[in-house]
Regions:
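Nucleotidyltransferase catalytic core that binds NTPs
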Residues: 1-154
């Protein structure tokens, strides 16, 4: 007999993490059994033109410590998207066989967006459509911004 589990995937730079990110994670976890967070790597941060506030290792450690988060994946992508990371997670979660396949677990994947990202404009839309990853907007409003916080420290 097959079981279904919902896996929400959120992504971002989290440089630094703030209360808007926390709300995104908490709201995503309300609709999912598992929450995986893709943390954009330092190369992506440089491509974005953002100054380092925290290294990728620090950001991953902080995100992993949050109660709502079940797992963290440091982005494998070389551009500013998380397309390849989404493909990797799709392969990991599309179907996990346990006990000889009799008790398989199927996963419904959700790519969740916060207050300033929308499924009709995100660069990952094509991958989500191709792989059957559902996109959900509005998982937390634009409460705060890492850019705002960093500009206030100047």
């Amino acid at each position: 007999m097959s079981k279904k589990r919902v896996v929400a995937i959120a992504s971002g730079y989290f440089n630094p993490v703030h209360k808007g990110h926390i709300e995104l994670f908490e709201r995503a976890k309300e609709v999912a059994d598992v929450l995986i967070v893709i943390v954009n790597n330092d190369k992506q941060r440089e491509l974005k033109g953002s100054k380092e506030f925290q290294s990728e290792a620090e950001r991953c450690k902080i995100i992993q410590s949050l109660k709502a988060v079940d797992g963290v994946l440091l982005s494998v992508d070389e551009d500013r998207t998380v397309r390849e990371s989404l493909k990797l997670l799709y392969e990991r979660y599309k179907k996990i066989e346990m006990m000889g396949g009799e008790h398989s677990v199927e996963h419904k994947l959700l790519f969740v967006n916060g207050g300033d990202q929308f499924s009709n404009t995100v660069a990952e839309r094509d991958v989500c459509m191709e792989y059957g990853i559902y996109m959900i907007d509005g998982m937390g409003g634009k409460i705060q911004s890492s850019s705002w916080l960093l500009s206030e420290t100047k």
